[in-house]
Amino acid sequence: SIRTKVYQWNGKTVPPQNNFCTNASDLLFEKSDAMGSFRFHEWLICEVETDDGIIGIGNAALAPQLVKKTIDTYLTPLVLGEDPFDYSYIWEKMYRRTHAWGRRGLGMVAISAIDIALWDIMGKITNKPVFKLLGGRTKEKIPVYASKLYSQPIKDLQKEAESYVKQGFKMFKMRFGWGPKDGPEGMKKNIELAEAVREVIGYDTDLMMECYM
């Protein structure tokens, strides 16, 4: 069986903040809330249960109400009765049956929720971590980076960057706060923030810029 449920957060949330980060829907002619795409107040959980009672769990954060409808109406009939270890066939089946309206966005999010649950099932049946099923370890260590540094007053941004340096990070990712609609002046502000972070982390480190474009 396949069960879906959308959980909703009704507690305290961060109020909208201008230029918090750029928005993928940021257009030259549109003034919009810079945090609009980042309010994950709802979350979908997808449970796929085998005939033996083993439950795999998948999830989706983007448009969960629509993803639920997609899974319940279109994908569940395609998956029921299949062997979870035939995951490649199941994926292709879901993808090809939804190609007229899927192939990206909502369709792929829904397919992914089920696919994650299938991998969870396979991990539980084989009693192995899923990364082992996906090919296993390829290196002894994986470099990590500090990923936050959203647009904020320079002093606060530098203080945050300094805290990551003290933790030993050598790689960092920050966010641009001004997008296409802000024009050249907005890009200048992005550069100012990047320079401010560089002053703290030095030039022997890696600094990435997230534009959400």
Where are these regions (language model features)?
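Ligand-binding pocket scaffold of soluble enzyme catalytic domains
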Residues: C46, D86, I125, K155, ...
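Flexible, glycine/charged-enriched surface loops at secondary-structure junctions
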Residues: Y87, V130-L133, R175, D204
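Metal-dependent enolase-superfamily TIM-barrel catalytic cores that perform enediolate-based chemistry
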Residues: K141-M213
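Glycine-rich, aromatic-flanked loop segments that form ligand/cofactor-binding clefts
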Residues: L106, D115-S151, K155-D156
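Solvent-exposed alpha-helices and their adjacent loops that cap or buttress functional pockets
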Residues: S37-R39, G136-T138, E199-I201
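Metal- or metallocofactor-binding catalytic centers and their adjacent structured scaffolds
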Residues: D33-A34, E49-I125
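Structured beta-strand/loop patches that form or line metal/cofactor-binding pockets in enzymes
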Residues: S1-D52, I57, A61
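Conserved active-site and cofactor/substrate-binding residues in soluble primary-metabolism enzymes
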Residues: F40-H41, L66, T70, F85, ...
